[in-house]
Amino acid sequence: MSRPRKRWRDVDGVFLLDKPQGMSSNDIMQKVKRLFQANKAGHTGALDPLATGMLPICLGEATKFSQFLLDADKRYLVTAKLGERTDTSDAEGQVVETREVHVETPQILTALEQFRGDILQVPTMFSALKHNGKPLYEYARQGITVEREARPITIFELNFIEYHAPFLTLEVHCSKGTYIRTLVDDLGEVLGCGAHVTMLRRTAVADYPVAEMMLINELELLAESFPLSELDRLLLPTDTAVSKLPALHLDVEQSKAIGFGQRVKFANEQQLSGQVRLFSAENLFLGVALIDGNIIRPQRLITQSA
């Protein structure tokens, strides 16, 4: 007798996955989507297969706000091996250069100063950035190097954790668009010995709590033993994806107009400007709007369940 077909459903929220090593972000996202039987899913910035750690998975209506998490600050713990450069700048690549390591901790501390604050970074060829519609990594795999422009990034914190030659461990708090592999490769060049990433763990995205993260095998066990309603309790509310934005609570009439996508006048006693989170009179999350003086302009709205 054939098994009943899985029924996909509308389910909204953010699942905090502790990504395992060895899987692509897209593969693990698809697995989470299947376990929740969700109609729609999206991740919020890929982690390399080598990397582990926090990967927020947006389900349903939360996918409308995934860009906010893609743009959010991130934190990483990274271990680099000095003395070797690879073509991918991590341990999955081929070693392309080997040099002796004559580096002491004081040299490392001095070198780190160059990478704090606002800097320019040339993205690695082994990245998903596109050139003429094709990801850079596809060119790299064909042995083709494409000219890349340096991009502005911000390293808010770059903390020395430990150094046991040839392995160096650092903690990084950075802006969107930062490639940790490139950061390590550049640091290795400043130190004069080369370096590549051997361990990378994302420890934070925006303000999401580390304690809420769950491993995929834990989710699989729960899915085998409990109904979907129990799995849904693991989801964080959709509005957590935009928690950095100020909140604006509307009255009944304003909520109704916003629901139809209409602009709304309001007193703006809080003197708000820019993007805000909108909540109805019943404290339901409505979406994101742009405040222009005393006008609320809807930008991205939740589709409310009937």
Curated annotation (Swiss-Prot):
Reaction(s) catalyzed by this protein? uridine(55) in tRNA = pseudouridine(55) in tRNA
Q: Which Gene3D superfamilies match?
A: Pseudouridine synthase, PUA domain
Indicate the residues that form the catalytic site: D48
Q: What is its EC number?
A: 5.4.99.25
Family stated for the protein in its record = Belongs to the pseudouridine synthase TruB family. Type 1 subfamily.
Q: Name one Pfam family in it.
A: TruB_C_2
Give the protein's recorded name.
tRNA pseudouridine synthase B
If you read the UniProt record, what top EC class would you report for this enzyme, in one word? isomerase
Q: Which GO terms describe its biological process?
A: mRNA pseudouridine synthesis; tRNA pseudouridine synthesis
**Function (record text):** Responsible for synthesis of pseudouridine from uracil-55 in the psi GC loop of transfer RNAs.
Under InterPro entries, the record lists: PsdUridine_synth_cat_dom_sf, PsdUridine_synth_N, PUA-like_sf, PUA_sf, tRNA_psdUridine_synth_TruB, tRNA_sdUridine_synth_fam1_C, TruB_C
Quote one Gene Ontology molecular function term. Answer: RNA binding
Query: What is the scientific name of the source organism?
Result: Haemophilus influenzae (strain PittGG)
The UniProt keywords, alphabetically, are: Isomerase, tRNA processing
